[in-house]
Each structure stands twice: as structure tokens, then as C-alpha cells.
């Protein structure tokens, strides 16, 4: 093989939801106290930037505890009203699921899961949302139907029916 490099340049400034021309419903979702909110789309579609804008909105408007779990950390937050702890998979933690399990012991109000790739992470994120946390996550899907299919397909057969009942 040959040596190759891929570099993604990101702006140091986190754009606001208004600057991203996001609909007002995202501001409303950022004000929720619990639930599971998924941002979906293909690689490079703006999922991380959208979530950064949402977390930054929360940071500027709400005194709360936010934990982000990312691979890699793409934006650094300056703490304002919120206390924000950022974890990077591979550096601070070994996996999304272990980081999420650990985060739940730290009494967060808001949790950002950079990618929900496997059943354990998805299950923990759903449990966190059901137990009173506001959870944001991403999936590489292009429609609501594909997102539900991806979540259900990640679950073992014994859990698929329960997930269908909870989220449809």
C-alpha cells in the first residue's frame, strides 16, 4: 500500500443554529429535559456541526452538566452556563458504550454520543433517555425509515420487538 492522508478542516468557531439556517424546532429540541434526538445523514453532511451548534446553544442558555463522547472531538466548547466534559474515544475512553456507561454515573443532564454504531451503545442511549437524560446521537442514515431500520437491525432478535414498540 501507499501512504495516504485525509484532513478535514473545521472552523474553530462553533456556528449558531441561526447561522446554519436551522429550523426553530432544533432550538425547541435543545430546550427539552429528556429524550433521544438523532441527527442523521451521510459523512460530511453536517451532523457534527449541527450537534455542536445545539450543544453550544444549551451551553449559553442552561445551567446543566453536559458530557460529550466523540471520535474524534471536533469542536472545543468554552464553558458558559453549562459544565461540559468532553471524552474522546481512543484517547480518554476505549469505546462509545463504555464511555456512555461511565457517563451515566456522573449525573449528566445532557449526553452527546458522537456515533451510535452498535447495540450496546444504542441500548444505553435509549436507557439514558428513558431515565430522564437528554441524549443526542448520530447515525449514518438518510431517512427516518432507514434510521429505525438501522436501530432495529443493530438489536439482537429478542430486543427488536421491544424497540419497535418503544419508538414507532
Where are these regions (language model features)?
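Short, flexible helix-loop junctions that flank or precede catalytic/ligand sites
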Residues: 1-166
